[in-house]
Amino acid sequence: MFSKSIIAASLLTAVTAHQNFHQFWVNGVSPGYQVSIRMPPSNSPVLDVASDNITCNVNGNVVPSGVNTTAANEGDAITVQWDSSTHPGPIQHYLFGPVDDASMATGIGSWFKIDEYIEVNGTWASNLMDAGNMSYTFNLPTGMASGEYLLRSEMLALHSAQTVGGAQWYIGCAQLSITGTSGDSCGPSIELPGDYNATDPSIYIPDIYYGFDISTYTPPGGAVATCGASGSGATGAASATAVATSAVSSAVASSSAAGVSSSAVVASSSVASSVLASSSAVLPSSSVAAIVTSAPSTLITATSAPAATSSAVEVGDDECEA
């Protein structure tokens, strides 16, 4: 019989392995901790891909959202930071819009993928992020239409993907007002909910612990979109110019959160100089009382996996339940 202390310790491990998207930076500047993000009521995963929660997490479809919207320009470097987790899997990013008012957008409907980061040399993106302060940087596409958007950050945990419905979805949505240069749309797009299926081979992986080759893995959601007649898709850490963040921390205070956040940001080699020189990285709402913080510039590349992470998945992770 298990002792109460052992059971309690197991439950604590399961909960602390869960995660939320809690901060982002635009060209190295953040509007604040949990600012412009629709925060869910807990850090538990979404399990039902057919539910509305697959869009922006629990309560993420409630409008008006009561969340401020942060300004950005097409092509800007976006850094997201998540809570630490040992769960293996990819990270992807989508946009919903343009809309007139992001705070009134439910997120139910058409999304287009702007970034995906899967693995490097047999190490999952999530494990690489864990070695780099759980931060990851990509660029918004060019050729976008101006307007307000929902930015959906998705971490798919595959440690229980050997059973149908076992994959865990960690999702957070931020509100952005993006200035673009085109009136054209971005595509291809997918429907959420609708285009994710629990039995898709990218979601249900029976052999995840038995010889599965993650270098052959293709995440759900289709191809990364392109925008405008002469625009481009986003540039993420899966490309040759992308980089992952280092484990450099700085305290970030917020009037809406009493906790402390570690921050780190990177830019791709093609935009590094503009990131450092940008004077219009972000325009927080005047109602935002959080401190706007600059992120450190120390970088590590994501072209090789850390030596400490040698396996695709850790068997012990599948004990974590929602």
From Swiss-Prot:
InterPro entries: AA9, AA9_LPMO
Catalytic reaction list: [(1->4)-beta-D-glucosyl]n+m + reduced acceptor + O2 = 4-dehydro-beta-D-glucosyl-[(1->4)-beta-D-glucosyl]n-1 + [(1->4)-beta-D-glucosyl]m + acceptor + H2O
Entry-listed glycosylation sites: 53, 68, 121, 133, 197
Function according to Swiss-Prot or TrEMBL: Lytic polysaccharide monooxygenase (LPMO) that depolymerizes crystalline and amorphous polysaccharides via the oxidation of scissile alpha- or beta-(1-4)-glycosidic bonds, yielding C1 and C4 oxidation products. Catalysis by LPMOs requires the reduction of the active-site copper from Cu(II) to Cu(I) by a reducing agent and H(2)O(2) or O(2) as a cosubstrate.
Name this polypeptide is given: AA9 family lytic polysaccharide monooxygenase B
Co-factor(s): Cu(2+)
Keywords from the named record: Carbohydrate metabolism, Cellulose degradation, Copper, Disulfide bond, Glycoprotein, Metal-binding, Monooxygenase, Oxidoreductase, Polysaccharide degradation, Secreted, Signal
Pfam families in UniProt: AA9
EC number(s) recorded for this UniProt protein: 1.14.99.56
